[in-house]
Amino acid sequence: MPSKEFIIPLILLCFYSVNGFVAVISSLVELFIHKASWNSIKIFFYSLLILQCLCRCIIIGWGMIETVQGGEFYSNFPSLLFISYAGLVALQMIQFLPNDNQYLLLSEGKKNNHKVKVGTNILIFFNLFMYFGMFLLFGIAEKQVGNSTSFNHHGNHNSTTSTSTDEIPLVSTEVGELYLFGDKDPIYIVLDCFYFVCLLLLLIFHSYVGWKTYKRNKDLFGIKLNVIHLILLICIFIRSLLVIIDPSSPNNSILHIDTESWLIYIYTISYYVVGEIIPGMLLIVIEFLLPYHKRKDFINIGGELSSYQDVWKSENIAIHELLGMGGSGAMVHKCTVKKGPLRGGTFAVKVMKDCTNEDIESLENEIRVYEKLKSPYIVSYQGSSKVVGSSGQIFEIRLFMEYIPHTLDKYLLARSVCGDSNGGGSSRNLKNYFLHMQEYQSSPQSSISYYQNNNNNNNNSPLIQPQQQQQYVYPYYFRYSQVVWYLYQISIGLDNLHANKIAHRDLKSNNIFVTLSESEVKICKIGDFDISRSFNNPKVLNVLSNPTALQQQKLNNFFQSATTTTTTEQTTEPIEVAATTTPQTIHSAFQHDILSFGFIVLDFLTLSNYSCFDSKFDTSNYYDDDKFNNKSNTKIKKPDLPDYIKKDEKLWEPVIQLYKSCTSDDPNKRPSSLGVKFHLANLYKDIIESGTEVWSIEKDSSSK
């Protein structure tokens, strides 16, 4: 081989060696730092890419040493591997970056998983078809020509003889001519067309993935990953064109490079560098960024970070749209983690900026509450972070929680307008409501200002019934089994709070977060502990159980006057808190939660949000905390129960009695959270044992 014929093979050999080396290093980082599983798709991707680079290096080196006869089959086999691992990356992008609807409806999550499964099966069968088809065509070409080639890179065919007088000539003596399909043997035309179709399908698949994942990519990685993916699409498109348009002679291939023209040099190096080497490097970058790992032990594994808590630092978090505002004035946003073991995870973050001492105390209290609670029916706490100035002043506090976009008040609003005249409804309409409604409109039933405006601030004016204001829409009421099951979940969460001596103090439907399966509620979780109070402070309990003489005297002084004189701050705080943390105070605080739970029962029965009102009928007079006192002059008539309940009072009697007992005018007659939980547990058990109603959401969905 002349010395100048070594130039392009040597360049390509170096490029493929670098690609393979980078793939090996990346796979080791994925395994030992990112904690990817050995049998994960990530490692399968790197294995295919390393295999391709190895095959390219071997065949190029072999061709540089000696003339390889029939080696074109081996030189083109890595082209098939390129399509295989490029398809795997597209599949992973869909798998890891689902549509936002997955977070809105669990059914959408199932759809995404279904798409991934379908995509996996399509990719498997496509690979089987591609490899089988190519091997078959290579075999036919080997039999006809004796030197099987494809993709417009044909070996030396001068030794081939033909017995047909009208056979298409396989050799051209012209250099730099643009060869079209008519200048080749039909088997080569078929090979080129087959591979072109494979590349075209790969291009379409990646274009679809780019369209579906653009927004999530932008949220998580900025514009970086989208630009990388766009360059990849351009490279695949260029390679597809180069398969069809070939300025080289049929004697040219990666093993037999025609050196008569610089045009052929440029074409050959462009085909492999732009069409395979650069895309391979881009795919490595995309794969490395995708954080889809199988191992569950993320705690303290590090990743790019030194510790698990570093995940929540402000520079590692991308904050997105505003979700709402907490009771303390903190802003709640949707956010994603940009790097670390939880990279790509979506969470809700409560942000308190320009913190005063009261703000810091409020949010730190909420963090302490979350840290003590572990229940599937309480919004889970993920972590927290602080931005501290050089002087030690705290400028910002962030509290990270699991992301649940729906609240019970919005779901009740949806059901209140998705029914029919018979009190039933359409699950399809309800599902479409959640999928296609961009923003929820405020319910007139969620604010007392609605009634204030209509009552003209006149206590003697006619009382307004909420249901009378909605016309031309019908409610989609819950079934008995659903109401019992949802209330049972909330009661478990509430009892978990009270068992830990924590009073929520702001229990209402817009602080109950719900996940959905199809169009039905699957799980109810209590959240938003902005103004909750914990009564198990060790210092306070010690003061109450075993006060010193000085502490006892200060307790007596506190009850005798509105203020207390203290000598030191360390003594004052537990005394003041202890003075307001008597068994009677704790019982009263818990009874507030039970009263609020009773209004949530009413919300389920009427599809209204009475628990969100500032005024809660006459029972509001029993709130001891000023936070809950009825400060408005608006009167709201205690609502009548809907007709569907009156038609079957025997069935609904246990739930109605629970509602009445929880909203009793005498707080001492209200049940405890444990009593509520046991009552609903028995109702739930009766439903299952009787089999009169299908209580399982999954069964309900499958029967529709």
UniProtKB/Swiss-Prot annotation:
Q: Give any Pfam family that matches.
A: PK_Tyr_Ser-Thr
InterPro entries attached to this UniProt entry: Kinase-like_dom_sf, Prot_kinase_dom, Ser-Thr/Tyr_kinase_cat_dom, Ser/Thr_kinase_AS, TF_kinase-domain_protein
**Which keywords accompany this UniProt record?**
ATP-binding, Glycoprotein, Kinase, Membrane, Nucleotide-binding, Serine/threonine-protein kinase, Transferase, Transmembrane, Transmembrane helix
Zinc listed as a keyword: no
Residue positions of the active site: 506
Q: Name one GO cellular component term.
A: membrane
Q: What domain of life is recorded for the organism?
A: Eukaryota
- EC id: 2.7.11.1
What SMART domains does the entry give?
S_TKc
Q: Which residues are glycosylated?
A: 147, 158, 251
| Residue span, Protein kinase domain | 317-682
Identify its membrane topology class.
Answer: Multi-pass membrane protein
Q: Which family does it belong to?
A: Belongs to the protein kinase superfamily. Ser/Thr protein kinase family.
**What is the protein name given in its UniProt record?**
Seven transmembrane domain-containing serine/threonine-protein kinase 2
Gene behind this chain? 7tmk2
